[in-house]
């Protein structure tokens, strides 16, 4: 047994200059796992609670000392002597200790940091990489794949101080032979886009996730400049590279309408879905995330009906990595893919359950970072260890994003042909 002999929590900083929670789990054999909780900007209302102190005299109320105290107090006491390899048992102990539906007593940030740190420590004690341990926990030992990256090269919405309403415009290097080549393609397009924006006299400042954040005349113009950048980088749009959007539509849903303030347009629910479909008819958009508000289930049914057979429709705020909500979506034929964010649900065990449920229902699962990140690269191992097939971890800029890409490079080097890169086949509706 990999017995836990100590659990330590601390307050560290995330990529936006806000505090977050880091945890260490120490085992009897001298193994130490360490992990940090990320934090989102555009958040679903049903996400597990990120516990903040609310003390305006520290970090504008965003301190996490209470969450840290929970780790160093009741969580540590409950986990001492337990087997770190028994992930489901550890997570259930913390869930029961919290006793609330959304982890608002101990904080999902506290529980998640310990959950991931325990997994890392257990992997070390077994002498195997984290991705291999995750595959075993997932019930799929030895089954791996390298994910297709969704690279967020233009930021808007809550991730940038510009007039672009849609939050993320992403490129997917689906024509690459392997992950290393995909990463190179994305980097070259990113640098090409910088030159295109500069030539138009547009800003090349970056947003929270490392993508450029220029002011543009419309959301369609963002797609147009990306098309130019892809072509000037020497690639063919629609063959080598496809496009993906994260609308984060909940952020501009007001009084039953979708208000694109940046371009002065207001749509009803079906009208906004039709607008997105028109963009997908003009450009090779193969994935759209949160194309409607999290509560607009009737609208989601329409969007799935008109686009779900050809385009991957990803539920982020819609499903919040929650199996109960995902079950409802599957039963009602809502969307066809789920975004997976550890901290929306608050433990590794519950995260793996959501991925398995999605796959069993024929949905895809897209592993994702948050806009507030750290150097922690666990999501890279999660993507490979569950053979999820797709990952969102920002642009080729900002060390908090690049850390995940670099970890994926290391993993691909280790696994070689055991972790194939399947490109377009990984995306719902494209196989």
From Swiss-Prot:
Its cofactor is Mg(2+). The gene is eno. Keywords: Cytoplasm, Glycolysis, Lyase, Magnesium, Metal-binding, Secreted. Catalyzes the reversible conversion of 2-phosphoglycerate (2-PG) into phosphoenolpyruvate (PEP). It is essential for the degradation of carbohydrates via glycolysis. Pathway: Carbohydrate degradation; glycolysis; pyruvate from D-glyceraldehyde 3-phosphate: step 4/5. CDD domains: enolase (cd03313). The lineage of its organism: Bacteria, Pseudomonadati, Pseudomonadota, Gammaproteobacteria, Alteromonadales. It is found in: Cytoplasm; Secreted; Cell surface. The keyword tRNA-binding does not apply. SUPFAM superfamilies: Enolase C-terminal domain-like (SSF51604), Enolase N-terminal domain-like (SSF54826). InterPro entries: Enolase (IPR000941), Enolase-like_C_sf (IPR036849), Enolase-like_N (IPR029017), Enolase_C (IPR020810), Enolase_CS (IPR020809), Enolase_N (IPR020811). This is Enolase. Binds a second Mg(2+) ion via substrate during catalysis.
